[in-house]
């Protein structure tokens, strides 16, 4: 049994042929394909090597850069925007500010944080891409309360022109009110006083006998719904049904 199992990674071209033959299904290896075939087999499965065979850090960095170039040309990394200055792998992913802009931002954050007691570590992590701010709505679309809170047109309530009533106008209005009250009293006297129903019937009977047929008087008025036989007999006598 092999104690040091070897991990074999296929190239992107072989992965593409495998994915094409898999009935058109998208495989994860098609997107995240890493080619590390440039590494020598001795460096992959030999944990300890002699000092003569050890590579210098500069040569290892050069080999890693060449391997990253192959990675950039395949998978989802090919869709990332390319930088104008450098062609390294990190420049495709992270877009930092230039050195001059970064130094000014660090100095400004350091001066502001020294006054407040903080450090200047937050300035080094700032990116070159500024976050776009949302466009402000026009002034006429803002509500009335928000328009004058931020120093708008009306810092306070709008002035209202309230007319001042003079003493002469007040006296004239009082006289008009008194005259209207007097006219209302005269109209009530002309209409007559309110009388109960039986007195109205008595006055109408005194004027003419034809006004005696009224719902306000008669045999049924004294019954109040208790016995309607007298009402029935009175109606029959008046109509001639009963002699």
From Swiss-Prot:
UniProt keyword Hydrolase present: no
Acidic residues: compositionally biased ranges: 22-32
Up-regulation conditions: Slightly induced by abscisic acid (ABA) and salicylic acid (SA).
Polar residues biased stretches: 10-20, 47-67
Superkingdom, natural source: Eukaryota
Location(s), subcellular: Cytoplasm
InterPro entries reported for this sequence: Senescence_reg_S40 (IPR007608)
Gene Ontology biological process: leaf senescence; response to abscisic acid; response to salicylic acid
Positions of the UniProt region annotated as Disordered: 1-68, 107-143
Keywords: Cytoplasm
A GO CC annotation given for this chain: cytoplasm
Family membership: Belongs to the senescence regulator S40 family.
PANTHER family membership: EXPRESSED PROTEIN, PROTEIN S40-7
Name by which UniProt lists this protein: Protein S40-7
């Amino acid at each position: 049994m092999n104690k040091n199992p070897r991990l074999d990674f296929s190239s992107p071209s072989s992965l593409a042929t495998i994915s094409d033959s898999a009935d058109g299904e998208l495989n994860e290896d098609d997107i995240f394909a890493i080619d590390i075939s440039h590494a020598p087999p001795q460096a992959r499965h030999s944990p300890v090597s002699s000092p003569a065979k050890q590579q210098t850090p500069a040569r290892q960095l050069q080999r890693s850069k060449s391997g990253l170039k192959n990675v950039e040309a395949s998978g989802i990394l090919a869709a990332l925007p390319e930088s104008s200055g450098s062609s390294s792998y990190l420049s495709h992913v992270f877009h930092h500010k230039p050195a001059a802009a970064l130094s000014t931002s660090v100095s400004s954050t350091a001066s502001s944080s020294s006054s407040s007691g903080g450090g200047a570590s937050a300035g080094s992590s700032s990116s070159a891409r500024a976050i776009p701010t949302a466009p402000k709505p026009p002034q006429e679309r803002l509500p009335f309360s928000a328009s004058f809170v931020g120093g708008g047109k009306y810092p306070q309530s709008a002035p209202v022109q309230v007319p001042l009533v003079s003493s002469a106008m007040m006296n004239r209005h009082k006289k008009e009110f008194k005259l209207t009250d007097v006219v209302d009293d005269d109209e009530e006297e002309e209409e007559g006083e309110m009388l109960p129903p039986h007195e109205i019937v008595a006055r109408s009977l005194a004027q003419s006998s034809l006004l005696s047929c009224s719902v306000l008087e008669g045999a049924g008025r004294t019954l109040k719904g208790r016995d309607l036989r007298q009402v029935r007999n009175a109606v029959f006598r008046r109509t001639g049904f009963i002699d």
